[in-house]
């Protein structure tokens, strides 16, 4: 059962309590501290991004295409759709001979209010570059290009890229591939269902 983790006070009075489950493990994977159920299964969602970002590095795409540390950081995380982020995504796509039209992450307004307001003020619409997962998707596309895999359908579970990603998730988590549940994340790629 989830445990209280955060209490919010307003004017000295308890306004709300947020519950959750958490686990801390050592380098051997042994649970050293927990709240609630440390074996609770959940979708990793964006918490998987640093692991998903290993493939562009391991495949050699990061080196081959001259990806800077700043650009690679956008592959590893969710971003706010600010110009610094969209520029990095566009730069990486160009370095790998790709374009925004190769992305399949979808479109939404930037999470940054300033960036979203700037688009509205300019009468412009958001693009896939503004999607908070466009960096991750760019990393996936660069990996496909480097490995000689088709970029078509790179987001589908049976694509070689997603199979390789599942292999890495299994290896790092210590959970067998056939025990990892799959769903579809909000940006169209597989999302992994594993214990905390």
Q: Model-predicted segments: where are they?
A:
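Glycine/charged-rich beta-loop-alpha catalytic/anionic-binding loops adjacent to active sites
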Residues: 29-39, 71-72, 120-125, 176-185
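A generic, well-ordered mixed alpha/beta core segment in the N-terminal half of proteins
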Residues: 70-137, 143
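Active-site helix/loop module of the DD-peptidase/beta-lactamase fold
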Residues: 77-81, 85-88, 165-177
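Active-site-proximal helix/loop microenvironment
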Residues: 126-162, 170-196
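Generic secondary-structure signature for well-ordered alpha-helical cores
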Residues: 27-30, 61-62, 94-98, 146, ...
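Short, charged, amphipathic alpha-helices and their helix-cap/turn boundaries
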Residues: 108-122, 160-175
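Active-site SXXK
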Residues: 44-62
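Beta-lactamase-like hydrolase cores
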Residues: 1-39
């Amino acid at each position: 059962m989830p445990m209280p983790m955060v209490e919010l006070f307003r004017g000295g009075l308890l306004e709300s309590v947020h519950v959750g489950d958490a686990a801390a493990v050592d380098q051997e994977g042994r649970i050293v501290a927990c709240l609630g159920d440390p074996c609770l299964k959940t979708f990793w969602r964006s918490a998987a991004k640093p692991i998903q970002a290993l493939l562009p590095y391991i495949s050699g795409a990061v080196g081959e295409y001259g990806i800077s540390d700043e650009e690679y950081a956008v592959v590893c995380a969710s971003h706010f759709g600010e110009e610094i982020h969209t520029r990095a995504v566009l730069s990486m796509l160009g370095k790998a001979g790709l374009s925004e039209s190769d992305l399949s992450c979808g479109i939404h307004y930037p999470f940054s209010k300033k960036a979203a307001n700037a688009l509205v003020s300019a009468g412009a619409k958001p693009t896939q570059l503004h999607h908070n997962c466009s960096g991750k998707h760019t990393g996936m596309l660069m990996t496909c290009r480097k490995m000689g895999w088709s970029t078509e359908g790179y987001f589908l579970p049976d694509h070689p890229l997603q199979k390789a990603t599942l292999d890495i998730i299994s290896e790092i988590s210590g959970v067998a591939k056939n025990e990892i549940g799959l769903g579809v994340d909000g940006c169209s790629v597989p999302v992994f269902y594993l214990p905390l």
